Amino acid sequence: MSQRRRRSLARPAALLLAVAASMALPALAADTAPVTLKDAYAESFLLGTAVNDDIVAGRDTRAQALVPRHFNALTAENVMKVEELHPTPDSWNFGPADAFVAFGQKHDMFLIGHTLVWHNQTPAWFFQDAAGNALAKDALAERLRAYIEVVAGRYAGKVQAWDVVNEQIGEDGTYRDTTWVRGIGDGDELMRLAFTYASRYAPDTELYYNDFNTWRPEKRDGIVRMVKQLQAAGVRIDGIGMQGHWGLDYPAIADIEAAIDAYAALGVKVMITELDVDVLPLTKEGQIIGQGMTHPQFQLPEFKRFLDPYRDGLPAEVQQRLADRYAELFALFHRKRDVISRVSVWGVHDTMSWKNGYPIPDRTNYPLLFDRQYQPKPALDTVLQVPRKR
């Protein structure tokens, strides 16, 4: 065979190989493309985060890009709290909350309004009459009804869920001495009123109770009792949000699992909400610590160095502990995916985390899955790996 004939045969063969290779490239790219959180857990539960107004409004553009890539559920961090929506008796401010809803709808996300009933971030006037005196029980109940009518009614059909009541049960399982409990006079009645009104004005919206330290046996049992009394009264409650403000070594996985099982046994949805993992010293019992840290002794330089040891960066060994902790938490969540409907981290990147200022102000914390440069941390990779190993 002549050289010319060989070359003429080689040309179509080479062309076929080139076409085949070009067709294979997209498949190869798809196989090696980094998986996202929502994709990794698509068959397990929703993967959510909390967003602030900077993200929604586009002032934090890099975080805004990360949100729809990794998450399919959104909680309003602050813009749906009473002090934001209804700051004075004569004023309403729906702009930021409306923008939150529009952002979530644009990206086809499951939206959680947060929150209708909470003693914090609710202005003092809400509990007072025009003269500044405490409202009588019936007047406060009517104010609650009217507020829920306006807010839950406005967003009915736009948000898929509400954290109706937030943080009203204490560590011993009884009701906390909050402005809401004092004003209504009975915690059980407060719950019945709040969930009744929410169900009335948002009939197709899921209704949740949300709280911290829900893993503690005494508090867990108090929440279980509260849910049972609502159910016995025929009042709808659809889920329990277990806030995940946890640390590198607490709470024990067994305690979290026992709480998940107890809430699931009620026939309601279970969600892990507000998840972040604190790496700093003195974080457990944050409300108590925050009060104690106001003492002048703790303002001395040596205490500041002890309390804020990672201002210049997180050591590799602590970074690894953080990754290991996230891995064991998500391994539990994945194992319980038949009863857990959503896991939400409380923020996108470390800079925006409330843990930089709580329970001790002006610290540098590292509780989330993306760092201050918006880069994924080793913890993110461990979380992504969990479903692949099961």
Question: Which residues are covered by each model-predicted region?
Answer:
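Bacterial N-terminal signal peptides
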Residues: 13-24
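Boundary/entry segment of secreted carbohydrate-active catalytic domains
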Residues: 31-73, 77
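Aromatic-rich peripheral "rim/lid" segments of glycoside hydrolase catalytic domains that contact
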Residues: 33-37, 125, 154, 163-188, ...
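Substrate-binding cleft and catalytic face of glycoside hydrolase catalytic domains
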Residues: 35, 73-87, 96-215, 281
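Acidic (Asp/Glu)-rich catalytic clusters
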Residues: 38-42, 61-72, 98-110, 152-156, ...
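Hydrophobic faces of well-ordered beta-strands that scaffold small-molecule active sites
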Residues: 47-51, 72-76, 111-115, 160, ...
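Acidic-and-aromatic substrate-binding clefts and catalytic sites of carbohydrate-active enzymes
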Residues: 50-61, 82-95, 169-174, 213-222, ...
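Short, acidic/polar
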Residues: 54-69, 143-151, 218-230, 326-332
